Each structure stands twice: as C-alpha cells, then as structure tokens.
C-alpha cells in the first residue's frame, strides 16, 4: 500500500553566490557549519523519504514489508552507479564503515596487512581483533613527514607475507587524498586493497574500483543520515575473503527456513549479517540519487573553491595549514593551527562567530561542502583575525 506523498520539508533557498545552485537548496544547515567531515546534515529528499517510508509502515498491510524491502535494491543500484561500471550485485548495504572493515579483517585467515599509523580507529580495531584470534596480523606503516601514505612508501613496506593494504582514501586529519591507483599498481594482483572511503565518497573523483573491498558510511559527505553505508567487493575480494561473518541473509536461498546451513551467496550479499532498516535504505538511496543528479564533478569543484578560500583565510590570519598544498592531493578538509593561540581559544572565537568546526587538542579542522557559502568563509576570517595578540 503506497502512502500519500508528504508535504515537502520547507527549506530556505540558497543564492547562486553561496552554495552550489541546484544542490544547496536541499539543505538547511546553519550558516557557519564547517564540520562535514564529522557529520553532514541530511537533505530535504532524505528527510521526506524517511517520513514517507515511516508513514507507509504505519499503515501496514499484507504487502507493506515486501514493498519496503525493495528500498535495499534501490540503494545498491544508486551506489553502483556512483562507483561507475559496477554491477549492483557487487554492492552490499552496511549500517556503518566499521562493519565492512570487520568483514575484511575476519575474512583473511593469515598473512600480514599494512595499516597506516594514526589511521582513524575504525581501521585499526578490526585488524587487532582478528590478530588476537590468530588470523591476519596488522603491520603499522608510518606516513612520510607530511602525513602522506604514498605508493613508494607502500612498495618499500611490502613483504612476501603481505596479503593486503588497508587505508583511508582521504585522511580524516589532513584531507590528504591517497593515490589509490598508484597503490593498486605497486601491490600487484596478489594482494587486496581495502579502502575506507567515508571522507571522500560523493565529493572526490577517485578511482574507487582500484579497491578490492571498499567501505563507506553515508552520514558524512553523502549526507544521508546515520546507519547508512555500503560495501563494494571486487571479484578478487569475493575469491580471497572467507565469509567468516556471513549471517542468515548472506546465504543462498536465505528465504528457505529449513534449519540447514546454506552456502554463502556468490556475490557481495555474502557480507550481509541480517536485514537492515528499509527506512534507512530508502533514505540512503535518496541521498545517493541527489549526488548522482548533481554530479560529483560539480560538487567537487565547489568544495575545492571553498577549501582554497578557507586555506587563504587561515594563512592571511597567520595560521599554519596542515593540509596538502596541491589541490589534487586534498579533499574538503582544512586542518590548521594558530601559533599564537591554543586550539581551545581559537575554537571559542569560531563559535562566537557561529562557526562549527572540529576541535582537537593539537589542531582544528574545517570541512566545507557544496552548500557552504562565502558568508561562512567570512565568519572564519572574523574569528581568526580577532584572536588576542
């Protein structure tokens, strides 16, 4: 039973001089919001889809559950289109990035995996837990002096025991974009490349299918809300990874409830543990479809412009930018320090000007999106130039 369409969420329009026209109108975050690397406020489409599906579930009849469950395929199809030439069967939905990384870690029975030092903890704990069970062992890979994990560093660290490399496509601290194509080339066809794409998916044009196992969440740059995400598995990953964590929905003939163990599904469905919420699947589909309609290239270009403006603003105020200099090496993150002020003091000034940023003990992080306005950059300028001398 289809529910009547809800009244669309009334968001304010954005001017063309502010956010990206045709995209920014979907959003209602406050001016000054620069924390997309932590959480991306969802779009009107995501909110409306969530409301519609919940209303549909509230009027449940004999066909409601089956109809709602079709949202899972809709989301997988959208994710496959975003990745490029990928079949939907190569995609499985996830509730978060960590779940996908646990599938990778527990799927490798032996050998070593290179994991960059100072990675986000979600790319550390799965390998540590697997190692304690006697499976694959993590080996720390130290970045260069600029915090980069380059193909040459990876090449030098490879040993005959290395079975995989696991890293973030975009570093959460600095916004550095990993050279996925170069790393894929140096590790060769006999090792797996595991990629956490959460800080770049939908906003950075990277060769995503260089990864054998790619995982991402939808709550940051894809702006689809929490408990959303997907996994892409290449044919090589499906061949090499043991389906250790496969649940009842990840097997052949999952709907046949005969109390027998079924074989794992032949495609990415084998990474399913159980049914996920069709409401969040529909919301995720709506978020992905908005990115597809807008175009990653347009979103990326707007973010690059705002990021460059933020970098200039920080430097003009005497700040030290920790993010990469070259535009092709950075995404939407600007990490910086102010030599004459502690991060907590800078954070207080930013907050006074209505700027939302990530504050860490040793640095601050600004992250702009395609809805970020010039007025937001001006707020940062006022905050940094009014610091006490």
Please give the residue ranges for each predicted region.
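Pyridoxal 5′-phosphate
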Residues: 1-389
């Amino acid at each position: 039973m289809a529910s009547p369409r809800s009244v669309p969420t009334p968001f304010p329009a954005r001017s063309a001089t502010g956010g990206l026209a045709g995209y920014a109108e979907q959003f209602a975050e406050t001016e000054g919001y620069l924390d997309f690397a932590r959480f991306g406020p969802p779009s009107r489409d995501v909110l409306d889809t969530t409301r519609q599906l919940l209303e549909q579930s509230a009027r449940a009849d004999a066909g409601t559950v089956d109809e709602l469950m079709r949202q899972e395929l809709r989301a997988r199809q959208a994710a496959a289109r975003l990745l490029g030439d990928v079949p939907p069967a190569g995609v499985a939905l996830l509730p978060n990035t960590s779940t996908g990384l646990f599938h990778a870690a527990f799927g490798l029975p032996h050998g070593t995996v290179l994991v960059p030092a100072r990675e986000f903890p979600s790319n550390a704990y799965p390998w540590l837990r697997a190692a304690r069970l006697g499976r694959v062992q993590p080996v720390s890979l130290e970045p260069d002096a600029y915090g980069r994990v380059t193909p040459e560093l990876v090449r030098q660290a490879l040993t005959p025991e290395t079975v995989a490399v696991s890293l973030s496509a975009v570093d959460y601290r600095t916004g550095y974009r990993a050279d996925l194509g170069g790393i894929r080339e140096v590790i060769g066809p006999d090792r797996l490349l595991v990629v956490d794409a959460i800080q770049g998916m939908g906003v950075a044009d990277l060769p995503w299918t260089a990864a054998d196992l790619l995982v991402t969440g939808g709550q940051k740059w894809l702006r689809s809300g929490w408990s959303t995400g997907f996994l892409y598995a290449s044919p090589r990953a499906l061949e090499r990874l043991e389906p250790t964590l496969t649940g009842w929905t990840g097997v052949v003939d999952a709907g046949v409830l005969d109390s027998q163990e079924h074989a794992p599904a032949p495609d990415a469905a084998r990474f399913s543990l159980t049914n996920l919420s069709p409401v969040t699947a529909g919301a995720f589909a709506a978020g992905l479809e908005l990115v597809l309609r807008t175009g990653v290239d347009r979103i990326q270009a707007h973010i690059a412009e705002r990021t460059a403006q933020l970098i200039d603003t920080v430097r003009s105020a005497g700040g030290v930018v920790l993010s990469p200099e070259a535009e092709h090496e950075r995404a939407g993150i600007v990490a910086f320090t102010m030599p004459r002020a502690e991060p907590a003091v800078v954070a207080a000034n930013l907050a006074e000007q209505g700027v939302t940023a990530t504050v860490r003990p040793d640095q601050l992080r600004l992250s702009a999106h395609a809805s970020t306005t010039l007025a937001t950059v001006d707020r940062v300028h006022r905050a940094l130039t009014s610091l006490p001398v």
